[in-house]
């Protein structure tokens, strides 16, 4: 089952449509009241390399795709971004460039990510992502944390991604909290 309390589920690109469908179903159950929000565990979805998952891309609004049946993975993913956080389903995504951000999600969906980390990029891309050209002046081993809700922009030194052992340890600690 995908929604174990603080369980960890790793998925491949081939499994993403199924996972997004299950998350979408869970979100709809929470929205309708079938799953009480008070007792429902928070779900955190980490997507490393969102730009690589083409099935999650927002479809053209004017395309002539079938209007009947289940929502496409891209449409369901967009709904998760725009409606999920209020229902306890949170997304953390890494994308390699601003062009790929535009390919991967709608402008409305991008505004739902109120905390963003950016590395050095062009002034135009920086202004589009964090409303400031400051990321164009970043040096080596520097990043900016933009918190839209607090209206802050903080420079920091990022570190390498944690190894698999760290993720296992973090999952164990989260499971103990329950």
Specify the residue positions occupied by each region the protein language model found.
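Generic hydrophobic/packing signal
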Residues: 48-51, 81, 130-134, 145-146, ...
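Conserved P-loop NTPase motor module
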Residues: 56, 60-66, 74-75, 115-117, ...
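Phosphate/diphosphate-binding loops
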Residues: 122-127, 131-150
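Generic secondary-structure transition motif, activating predominantly at the C-termini of alpha-helices
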Residues: 24-27, 133-134, 160, 174-175
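P-loop NTPase catalytic phosphate-binding loop
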Residues: 1-128, 178
């Amino acid at each position: 089952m995908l929604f174990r309390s603080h369980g960890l589920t790793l998925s491949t690109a081939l499994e993403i449509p199924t996972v997004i469908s299950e998350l979408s179903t869970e979100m709809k159950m929470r929205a309708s009241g079938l799953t009480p929000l008070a007792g429902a565990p928070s779900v955190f979805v980490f997507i490393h390399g969102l730009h690589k998952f083409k099935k999650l891309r927002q479809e053209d609004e004017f395309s002539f795709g079938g209007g009947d049946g289940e929502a496409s993975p891209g449409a369901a993913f967009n709904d998760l971004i725009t409606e999920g956080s209020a229902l306890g389903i949170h997304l953390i995504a890494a994308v390699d460039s601003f062009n790929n951000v535009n390919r991967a999600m709608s402008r409305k969906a991008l505004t739902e990510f109120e905390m963003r980390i950016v590395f050095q990029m062009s002034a135009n891309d920086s202004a589009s992502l964090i409303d400031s050209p400051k990321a164009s002046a970043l040096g080596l081993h520097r990043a900016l944390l933009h918190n839209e809700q607090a209206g802050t922009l903080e420079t920091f030194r990022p570190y390498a991604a944690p190894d698999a052992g760290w993720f296992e340890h973090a999952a164990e600690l989260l499971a103990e909290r329950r």
